[in-house]
């Protein structure tokens, strides 16, 4: 993969991850009023996503690029708006939307890793992307677990 194409892909991830940081921080603030533990989980996920932002920004710079200024401005605002909107729509809707967003990130990470492995290039970048991918899977599993808990609680109320 040529450098220009790789930088475009890394900028996509940079913007996506920036969006997720503010999305999950907004949700953390909303849901911690319902349940402190829930707020802490969203906050922790946001901090992990911030680590992804930092790692991707570092790789962009190592390749001679600069993290996109548009991403720095637009993604956080979109993340806050989406986080607040989804949070106000309720926990179940937020969890489902988050799961969908994480699934997109997983799919995109897998494709980029596959492309880089095919080229047999950028082993350090592949490792960073693989670590991010593991985190995205963990986030998805947590969202799924919380959805299952909500569904079980709903079923108990029916009985």
Where are these regions (language model features)?
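Iron-associated oxidoreductase/ferritin-like identity signal
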Residues: 1-159
